């Protein structure tokens, strides 16, 4: 109906018809937007809760402290002070008081509010971070191994006192006259490339860059099959003679010390006198009538003092022996091997022997593996076979010394009536001898002083 009217009145009213449809299109649009906006900003509640959330944020002004005055701007970066910052000054606290004090001061451009005037320019001079030096561009190295390892390798190679080919040749010839420095061989072994490095070297044909020396070293290494294992064999051979000598000397010292201690009649007499002296002192107590005493009780003699506190029981023992059995004063001469034996740890000796035995097994493994090396290892294989045969004989000799030494050490502990470790027996006896000799020397000096004093008094008596 309205359309007909509109079409009939087209010539009279052309514009009015379009506005009503536009209003209809615009009128429905305004209502929808508000609900979606409210749903996005607020949770389930309608607009009133939104107003509640926005209202609480501003806290009451009285509790909030006034912010500290800003320090003047600096012209450069300064070294930071890594303190734990406080953001609020509690009323009545030191910081509250300082804040109020700062409010009363005038602020100048070159000063920070403080009890004293601080010059910003002076602080900048002293605590400036300074400009960081720009790193110098380093020339690229050949990507054989990582930069750190390459640098360490080059430094160590420069420290070697022998050319690498000569070192490897000496190892292959098992010739200690050309190279007998164990440390140099160990340093070289520590420079060995990984399997990945070795694989890369065998196929590398590019530019060597600044790693010329390193590249030559690695190329030299890959020429010999299992060169690292062969160098370890040579290192073992260099140390072997010294180790065998040390073990033999140590085991002989243990056997000699055990024999000397158990057969020394003077030591037995000393121990008997100490036992008698102790039983006299402990008469009528639970410690009296002893048939023996723990070995470490020997050291207590120097701690037991007489009434005048000038003489110890050790001094008294030496004094009695000097007057009644002076031949016992040098009992320590019977124990010539004691001091060297006291430096030996039987457990360490056993571990060294075990390490040598395991080392020989590795040598045998390399001997077997080198059979397929071809001519390059022919001389090495022959010399290694001879060395293994000789080394096994020497190790058997050491083992023949070790088992009796261990048995003698156990028998020595039984000799003193307790299950002492061998190291404790030797250390205690050695300490006792030193205390005994010191007490005797002090007694001699005291006797000389008393003799001089008596002579002086006699002279004074004559002059009267």
From Swiss-Prot:
Which residue ranges run through the membrane? none
Among Pfam families, the record links this protein to: FH2 (PF02181)
Q: Which InterPro entries match?
A: FH2_Formin, FH2_Formin_sf, Formin_homology_domain
Example of a GO MF term: actin binding
Q: Give the residue ranges for region: Disordered.
A: 1-74
Positions of the FH2 domain: 68-462
One GO biological process term:
actin nucleation
Family listed: Belongs to the formin-like family. Class-II subfamily.
Q: What is this protein called?
A: Formin-like protein 19
């Amino acid at each position: 109906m309205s359309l007909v009217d509109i079409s009939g009145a087209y010539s009279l009213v052309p514009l009015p018809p379009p506005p009503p449809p536009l209003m209809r299109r615009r009128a429905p649009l305004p209502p929808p937007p508000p609900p979606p906006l409210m749903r996005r900003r607020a949770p389930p509640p309608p607009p009133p809760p939104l107003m509640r959330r926005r209202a609480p944020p501003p806290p009451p002004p009285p509790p909030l402290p006034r912010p500290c005055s800003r320090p003047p701007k600096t012209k450069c970066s300064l070294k930071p002070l890594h303190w734990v910052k406080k953001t609020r000054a509690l009323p009545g606290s030191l910081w509250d008081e300082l804040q109020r004090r700062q409010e009363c001061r005038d602020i100048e451009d070159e000063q920070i509010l403080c009890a004293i005037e601080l010059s910003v320019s002076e602080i900048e001079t002293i605590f400036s971070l300074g400009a960081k030096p720009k790193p110098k561009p380093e020339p690229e190295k050949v990507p054989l191994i990582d930069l750190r390892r390459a640098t360490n390798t080059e430094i160590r190679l420069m420290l070697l006192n022998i050319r690498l080919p000569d070192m490897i040749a000496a190892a292959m010839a098992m010739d200690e006259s050309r190279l007998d420095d164990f440390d140099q061989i160990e340093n070289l072994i520590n420079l060995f490339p990984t399997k990945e490095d070795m694989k890369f070297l065998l196929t590398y044909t590019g530019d060597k860059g600044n790693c010329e020396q390193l590249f030559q070293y690695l190329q030299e290494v890959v020429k010999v099959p299992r060169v690292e294992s062969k160098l370890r064999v040579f290192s073992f051979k260099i140390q072997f003679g010294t180790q065998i000598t040390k073990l033999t000397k140590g085991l002989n010292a243990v056997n000699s010390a055990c024999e000397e201690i158990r057969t020394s009649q003077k030591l037995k007499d000393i121990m008997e006198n100490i036992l008698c002296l102790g039983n006299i002192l402990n008469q009528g107590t639970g410690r009296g009538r002893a048939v023996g005493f723990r070995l470490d009780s020997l050291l207590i003699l120097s701690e037991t003092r007489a009434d005048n506190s000038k003489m110890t029981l050790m001094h008294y023992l030496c004094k009695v022996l000097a007057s009644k059995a002076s031949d016992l004063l040098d009992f320590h001469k019977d124990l010539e091997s004691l001091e060297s034996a006291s430096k030996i740890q039987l457990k360490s000796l056993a571990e060294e022997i075990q390490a040598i035995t395991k080392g020989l097994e590795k040598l045998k493994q390399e001997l077997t593996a080198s059979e397929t090396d071809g001519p390059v290892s022919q001389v090495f294989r022959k010399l290694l076979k001879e060395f293994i045969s000789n080394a096994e004989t020497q190790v058997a000799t050491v083992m023949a010394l070790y088992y009796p030494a261990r048995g003698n050490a156990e028998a020595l502990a039984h000799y003193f009536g307790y299950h002492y470790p061998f190291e404790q027996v030797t250390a205690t006896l050695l300490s006792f001898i030193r205390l005994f000799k010191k007490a005797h020397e002090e007694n001699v000096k005291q006797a000389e002083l008393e003799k001089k004093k008596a002579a002086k008094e006699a002279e004074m008596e004559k002059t009267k």
